[in-house]
Amino acid sequence: MERIVVTLGERSYPITIASGLFNEPASFLPLKSGEQVMLVTNETLAPLYLDKVRGVLEQAGVNVDSVILPDGEQYKSLAVLDTVFTALLQKPHGRDTTLVALGGGVVGDLTGFAAASYQRGVRFIQVPTTLLSQVDSSVGGKTAVNHPLGKNMIGAFYQPASVVVDLDCLKTLPPRELASGLAEVIKYGIILDGAFFNWLEENLDALLRLDGPAMAYCIRRCCELKAEVVAADERETGLRALLNLGHTFGHAIEAEMGYGNWLHGEAVAAGMVMAARTSERLGQFSSAETQRIITLLKRAGLPVNGPREMSAQAYLPHMLRDKKVLAGEIRLILPLAIGKSEVRSGVSHELVLNAIADCQSA
């Protein structure tokens, strides 16, 4: 069992990583006997894990209600969020309730925002079931729903009480979702840890076949890196922005193509190549390093080009609505070397459009 602490003073919390956690009531601390829980999951995961998690919580003496949401990025919306509020109010659940997010990034982000908003804030626990949510979205307290004009535009910073990562969940993960999660894994190597990127080049095949020790190390290392960044910059005023490598381009793809048509990790993968091409055009990143990124993404089964039907110009309106924009200026996360990156303002729109075009004609 691995245990990592996100250090945020009184709001510090543990990330527990192991197989078989759904069999242990102690995995769901700080829940105690007699407490009330609203378990939030989706239609895909409910048949797989709802009864198991409900059972282990009830074994601990917790009173469990549940709400089952539709599955898909297109349902990460205010309308679906309202169904969670309705379920909480119908019981009713008070300020002493705990929301448990059992699912991937959509369930986790939406449940976290529900917890931040319901009666001005209740406790919640993240139980991520996809690789992407285990290595990234469940850690750090970013919660949100989408708006038709932009991804994650309505949300809050709100930290969970704990994160419970049961590695056994990956056994039921579809290959496309596994690849999507690997995009965020590869991101950590590019922006923060060149040695980890080297390890990924050597061990990607083991991750693709869900090798237990390799996957446990991979998730632990990603969570360590994320925890360090969040502890240093919880509200994304500086260092934490680096975690958005590829996201300015990727969110544009997701919004333009319709939420759910491109998985988040797929869009981020293409976006990371666009960021690398931008950095190349600025003369601060080598084509050889871009090729290393492209090769690793391709091996993971990820796209390295944007959608053919989306023109370079179509990216700009979305990028100008990006949450990192300051004073009307796009801020990009750009690699300087494998393992090192920067936040860059003032890049000309023409250069950015040319970098996007590089990734459409490649």
Curated annotation (Swiss-Prot):
Q: Which reaction does it catalyse?
A: 7-phospho-2-dehydro-3-deoxy-D-arabino-heptonate = 3-dehydroquinate + phosphate
User: Main site of residence?
Assistant: cytoplasm
For Zn(2+), which residues are the binding ones?
184, 247, 264
Which of UniProt's keywords are assigned here?
Answer: Amino-acid biosynthesis, Aromatic amino acid biosynthesis, Cobalt, Cytoplasm, Lyase, Metal-binding, NAD, Nucleotide-binding, Zinc
Query: Which residues of this UniProt protein bind NAD(+)?
Result: 71-76, 105-109, 129-130, 142, 151, 169-172
The keyword Flavoprotein belongs to this UniProt entry's keyword annotation: no
Entry cofactors: Co(2+); Zn(2+); NAD(+)
Q: What class of enzyme is it?
A: lyase
Q: What EC number(s) has UniProt assigned to this enzyme?
A: 4.2.3.4
List the InterPro entries hit by this protein, alphabetically: Dehydroquinate_synthase (IPR050071), DHQ_synth_AroB (IPR016037), DHQ_synth_fam (IPR030963), DHQS/DOIS_N (IPR030960), DHQS_C (IPR056179)
Q: Which pathway is this protein assigned to?
A: Metabolic intermediate biosynthesis; chorismate biosynthesis; chorismate from D-erythrose 4-phosphate and phosphoenolpyruvate: step 2/7
Keyword ATP-binding listed? The answer is: no
Question: Where is this protein localized, as stated in its record?
Answer: Cytoplasm
The record ties this protein, via SUPFAM superfamilies, to:
Dehydroquinate synthase-like (SSF56796)
A Gene Ontology biological process in which this protein takes part is: aromatic amino acid family biosynthetic process
Per the entry, the cofactor note is: Binds 1 divalent metal cation per subunit. Can use either Co(2+) or Zn(2+).
Matching entries from Gene3D superfamilies are given as: 3.40.50.1970, Dehydroquinate synthase-like - alpha domain
GO MF terms, alphabetically ordered: 3-dehydroquinate synthase activity; metal ion binding; nucleotide binding
**GO cellular component labels:** cytoplasm
Pfam family, any one: DHQ_synthase
Protein role: Catalyzes the conversion of 3-deoxy-D-arabino-heptulosonate 7-phosphate (DAHP) to dehydroquinate (DHQ).
Similarity remark? Belongs to the sugar phosphate cyclases superfamily. Dehydroquinate synthase family.
Q: What is this protein called?
A: 3-dehydroquinate synthase
What organism does this protein naturally occur in? Escherichia coli O139:H28 (strain E24377A / ETEC)
Which gene is transcribed and translated to give this protein? Answer: aroB
